[in-house]
Structures are given as structure tokens and as C-alpha cells.
Amino acid sequence: VPERTALNVHFKSPTDDYVKMFEQMEQDKIISTRGLKPDAVKYGELVFDVNSAYFYNHGGYEFAKQFYADAYKAAIKIVGGEQYILSAVMHADERNRAMSDALGQDVYHYHLHVVYIPVVEKQILWSKRCKDKSLVGTVKETIQQVSMSKKWDSKPALDEHGKPLLNANGKTVLRKSY
């Protein structure tokens, strides 16, 4: 419904087109494309969608705005930080035809779209070619790697005292995240 487009809520508006925003984040070293394949997925989208009747029964537009403001906060946690979110908009301009017809009045379908860059934290280790042999195998840098893969998202396995478990070589044992 075009006359309701102004009621859409932009929790985060894009500053440019997504490709340019991606390139700027790469230049600013917010993200890394190190090892990224040419056909890799560079963008993700979360859609928070709740049955129209829920909002209709709980206060409509104002209730939906607060609900999706909270959902946006959850999205920030899900994607790892607001800096990775390119845009987030709650749509308030789409009419639910079936409910509207059944109730004899306009009922709108509220939902939230969040477009983001998927990242995982990745530690880059010093290689065997490093001149200072004491550094080999230690963390050289930590990057935010653009990736939909969750294999880098593994967390250390902890003992009953909360300390990381080590394998026979003294390296931290990781719990698989997938």
C-alpha cells in the first residue's frame, strides 16, 4: 500500500548501495575477504515475521514498532555487531488480504528485514616461515572473515573449572559449532 510506505521504520538505513558499503568496510578493515572464493555468499538476510493477528490483537502499529525494535537488538547479537548490518527496515505497508477480508477492515502485515554481512572471527597464526621460531603457531592477528560457514565459530571446550581443555600437543580443544 504505497500511502503507508512512510510508516516503514528504518532501524538502520543503508549509507550507499550494498556493494559499495561492502567495499568500504573491507577498506576500513572492519571485514576481511582473505581466502574468499569468487562465488561466496557475501550477504545474509534475517526476516523476523510474526502472524498478523498477533499485532492486530496487541495494539497494531505501535506494538509492532516496539516488538521489532527489540527484534533488531536481537539481530545485532545474532550477526555479531551492528557494524555488520547494512540495513534493517520494518515493513508496515503490506496489507494482509485474508485477515482484512475476514474482519472487514484493513489489517497490515508487519515484519522486519535485516540485511547483513556474515562474519566469523578467525585467528591467523604465525607460519613456519616466520624468522622468530618462538612465534610459530601463535596468534598473529584476529580478523572478521566474511563467511557463512560456522566452522570458524567453534568455541574452546572447557573443563569443570572453566579453563580450556588442551590436546596432547598443548593446543586448545574446540567444540564443533555445526
How should each PLM-predicted stretch be described?
Residues V1-Y178:
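N-terminal nicking endonuclease/strand-transfer module with a His-rich metal-binding environment
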